[in-house]
């Protein structure tokens, strides 16, 4: 702390009684021990110690411990209720999971059955359509074969007349004379067989 000269004293205060203090020491009247360690006060200290601990014990026994015991009992009851409820909820959850898994298995089974039925229906439908198409194709094939045989028969009739005309033209060109139609027809028939 900064002290200005206005606050500072020029001279020390005078000592009353003419004594000056020149040493440090214990005053003559202050001899003895610290009171709690004085053996003369031990009996009263022990009495108050016993009274204090007795009152403290009664306070703990009558007030603090019943409250603490009640709190512990309430907490134990709450914990047991929570455990019971958790066990109940776990059972319900397990039952729900089992029901879900059973429904899932049934759904898979039903889906498999439905898929098989759809595949069988599609196969039967395809078989029916194939049979219809085969019948239509067989009918068209029969018609085509009939037309082909008709065309072939007509062509064979015409081939005979074409062969007769061609043979007649060849005989005329080679021999220079005409052959009769009966002779040419007989020659064509003999070659065709």
Curated annotation (Swiss-Prot):
The signal peptide stretch is none
Sorted keywords for this record are: ATP synthesis, Cell inner membrane, Cell membrane, CF(0), Hydrogen ion transport, Ion transport, Membrane, Transmembrane, Transmembrane helix, Transport
Q: What GO cellular-component annotations does this UniProt entry give? A: plasma membrane; proton-transporting ATP synthase complex
Q: Which Pfam families match?
A: ATP-synt_B
Q: Where does it primarily localize?
A: membrane
- CDD domains annotated for this entry? ATP-synt_Fo_b
Q: Name one GO molecular function term.
A: proton-transporting ATP synthase activity, rotational mechanism
* Topology of the protein relative to the lipid bilayer: Single-pass membrane protein
Read off the PANTHER family from this record.
ATP SYNTHASE SUBUNIT B, ATP SYNTHASE SUBUNIT B', CHLOROPLASTIC
Subunit and interaction comment: F-type ATPases have 2 components, F(1) - the catalytic core - and F(0) - the membrane proton channel. F(1) has five subunits: alpha(3), beta(3), gamma(1), delta(1), epsilon(1). F(0) has three main subunits: a(1), b(2) and c(10-14). The alpha and beta chains form an alternating ring which encloses part of the gamma chain. F(1) is attached to F(0) by a central stalk formed by the gamma and epsilon chains, while a peripheral stalk is formed by the delta and b chains.
Question: Function of this protein?
Answer: F(1)F(0) ATP synthase produces ATP from ADP in the presence of a proton or sodium gradient. F-type ATPases consist of two structural domains, F(1) containing the extramembraneous catalytic core and F(0) containing the membrane proton channel, linked together by a central stalk and a peripheral stalk. During catalysis, ATP synthesis in the catalytic domain of F(1) is coupled via a rotary mechanism of the central stalk subunits to proton translocation. Component of the F(0) channel, it forms part of the peripheral stalk, linking F(1) to F(0).
**Protein name stated in the entry:** ATP synthase subunit b 1
């Amino acid at each position: 702390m900064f002290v200005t000269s206005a606050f500072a004293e020029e001279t020390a205060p005078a000592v009353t009684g003419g004594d000056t203090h020149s040493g440090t020491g214990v005053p003559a009247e202050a001899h003895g021990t610290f009171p709690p360690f004085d053996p003369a006060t031990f009996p009263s200290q022990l009495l108050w110690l016993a009274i204090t601990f007795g009152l403290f014990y009664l306070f703990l026994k009558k007030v603090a411990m019943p409250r603490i015991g009640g709190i512990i009992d309430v907490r134990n009851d709450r914990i047991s209720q929570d455990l019971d409820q958790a066990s109940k909820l776990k059972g319900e959850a397990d039952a729900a999971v089992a029901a879900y898994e059973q429904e899932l298995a049934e759904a898979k089974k039903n889906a498999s059955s439905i898929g098989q039925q759809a595949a069988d229906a599609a196969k039967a439908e395809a078989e029916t359509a194939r049979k219809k198409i085969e019948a239509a194709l067989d009918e068209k094939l029969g018609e085509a074969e009939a037309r082909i045989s008709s065309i072939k028969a007509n062509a064979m009739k015409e081939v005979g007349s074409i062969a007769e005309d061609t043979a007649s033209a060849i005989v005329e060109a080679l021999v220079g004379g005409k052959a009769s139609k009966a002779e040419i027809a007989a020659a064509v028939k003999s070659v065709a067989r």
